[in-house]
Amino acid sequence: MGRPRLTLLCGVILAASAFTTPALAIDSADPLANETTAVAPAPVTRTGPSWAAPQIASVVAAGLMGPDVASFRPDDTLTREELHDAIVALGRPHAAPTDPTRVVTMRELDAQLVAAAGLLPSARQIRLAAAAAGLEPTDMLGTETVARLLGLRTNHPVGQEDLERSPKQPASRAEAAYSLAKLRLLDPSRIEAVRQVVATFSVPTLGEWQRLVLSRALRFVGYPYVFAGTSEKPQTIWSSSAPGNQLAVPGGFDCSGLVWRVFKLQPYDGAPSLADVLKGRTTYAMSGEVKKAQRISPGLVQPADVLFFGTQGTQSKPSEIGHSGIYVGNGWFVHSSSGGVTLQPLQGWYADELAWARRPLAEAGLTA
């Protein structure tokens, strides 16, 4: 997959790493047929060009969406007919929707584009591997992971987290333009690289507590990166640019917020002490809570360990730690970075900059 691009991880800048498509797709025949779409968010009023202006210009020029940029309506919700027309214009076969005016959710948008890339079998492989390990995956686990490995999702800047959308919220035409523009420019070699790396995904035999922790963590794959976010539900975060310094945002997480949600905010039945292990909310604080002698070296990590990444790799100090995640096993972990919450192979930058881990289960006196 190569070295990742520069991206936002937990508030600091780090280096991040043809078949007929059904009218509906997660990774099975028609999983969204009875889905309840979340209420559309209130339009975000901002002056100036859309955040997706370059991608809007790209898809308009390519004939995928809209007759011209001036009439594009970026903040309007996307319909299934519009998505169908765009996929067909890309040259991908796609069945016409039976309910063309129905709004497309974010997770449906991601799934449809993963299918258009020919990677629905890969997405299914991820979900089935997680299910085989007893992790109770959501039906969007595979498609949301593959969409992010392809680079189809983005992160809105700090202070504009209200533009983010959770999986069941309606997709805007701007979000669709961004993803379609990325898909249109994907080199076949990138698609093949994603197919090959997904083929490596597997989960080792897990202990009961590892299974419970990872089941919870994987439930959030597909949620957006929200700076200071700690919940899958709508939340209010502090923002220097918002009225009263309070900004209403959708469900989503930053990197340490995901770890905080998985281990801290909802005690596990039979293990109330696990919620007491983490004391500090930030990655910096979490990484520094374990003495140097108690740090888990990269070669000894186990499922459900919390991973810490720093600019100096294993030589990093707590002050140099800027990212965190939760190890799943067999070279994969789950984290929230610029594309949102996803499964990620421990390769490239992530392998180079993995500093150490801590084992909350053991710290709470629990066996795996």
Question: Model regions: which residues?
Answer:
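Secretory targeting and sorting signals
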Residues: 2-25
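Feature responds to low-complexity, polar/acidic, surface-exposed segments characteristic
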Residues: 24-53, 61, 65-80, 84, ...
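Glycine-rich, acidic and aromatic/proline-enriched surface loops and short helix-turn segments
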Residues: 58, 89, 115, 119, ...
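Surface-exposed patches in mature extracellular/periplasmic domains of secreted proteins
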Residues: 67-71, 98, 121-126, 224-233, ...
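Active-site-proximal alpha-helical segments within enzyme catalytic domains
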Residues: 83-86, 109-112, 176-182, 252-265, ...
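N-terminal capping segments
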Residues: 195-257, 261-272, 318-320
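...with weaker cross-activation on analogous glycine-rich loops/strands in unrelated enzymes
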Residues: 203-214, 260, 268-347
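Low-complexity, Gly/Ser/Thr/Pro-rich intrinsically disordered linker/tail segments
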Residues: 351-368
